[in-house]
Amino acid sequence: MHTIRLTPLEEDTGTRLDSFLSRRVEGLTRSAAARLLAEGCVTCDGAVPGKSYRIAGGEELCVTLPEAEEPEAVPQDIPLDVVYEDEDVIVVNKPVGMVVHPAPGHPDGTLVNALLHHCGDSLSGIGGEKRPGIVHRIDRDTSGLIIAAKNDAAHLALAAQLADHTLARTYECLAVGNFRQDSGTVDAPIGRSRSDRKKMAVVAGGRPAITHWEVLARYPGVTHLRCRLETGRTHQIRVHLAYIGHPILGDTVYGNRKPVPGLTGQCLHATGLRFLHPRTGCPVELTCPRPEEFERMLTKLQKRT
């Protein structure tokens, strides 16, 4: 068990306590917050509040949390869309909705579970038992190319390329709004949001983050972009585009909370991956097509023009 202390902001006044806790405590769902309240694990200025308590402002909250149990990664027979594979690396086209590795709340059904079944013992151990072979990640509701290493030498080589930006990742997305320029760069540091611990944000003192973008097509109220990452921060493209006023279509975290009909996630797809092969040093360049949902949305937009 461990305890955290929280002081609500002025903007939190009137918010239900369970909702506030789910926003401010990383990994805590609203239902889990409600259970903590019911079990007396939350105090407000030293007293246990009622389950319907709303933030008044200025109070001090104390939350006692049980230690999270890390799920064990086990092989699972989950179909994989393998784009490239050899004795050193495997590149997969990850579908929307698939989490990369097991974590509290997502104990199985992840890419790691699928890779363990597909590759057997042939995965790098550098990522540890929970993340074998994983060199980089993409969000659950982002689709596209992700690379995993089959041995430690390959993992170290790819991680070095990721650090010096020679492992290039290209994305396509549909962003809300119209861009005046044809291309640009967002250079803004990213860190954990101070108002919602589940979100990232552009914050002073955050980690350096650079995203390059270019316009592929313009539609009424929506722009089709290609984005290239110079760094790889959590939710980077989503945060940067929201920061400049153009959140990704379907992103209910950093954009409009109302889901977009026809989309099960944000319209963001990792279309391209370029790296030097860890064994031969030869360049490898891979692409994968946009998913059906993305294509259907493009077709709808094209019909409006």
Which sequence ranges carry the predicted segments?
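Pseudouridine synthases involved in rRNA/tRNA modification
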Residues: 1-35, 80, 195, 204-210, ...
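RNA pseudouridine synthases
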Residues: 1-185, 189-194, 287, 292-302
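Thr-Gly-centered strand-to-loop micro-motif
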Residues: 44-45, 101-102, 149, 200-202, ...
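Short alpha-helix capping/helix-loop boundary micro-motifs
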Residues: 45-50, 221-224, 259
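Short, surface-exposed secondary-structure edge patches
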Residues: 50-54, 226, 265
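Residue-level recognition of well-ordered beta-strand positions that form the cores
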Residues: 64, 174, 189, 214, ...
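Short flexible coil/turn linkers enriched for glycine and charged/polar residues
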Residues: 86, 140-141, 167, 207, ...
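Short beta-strand micro-motifs in enzyme catalytic cores
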Residues: 90, 171, 223-225, 271
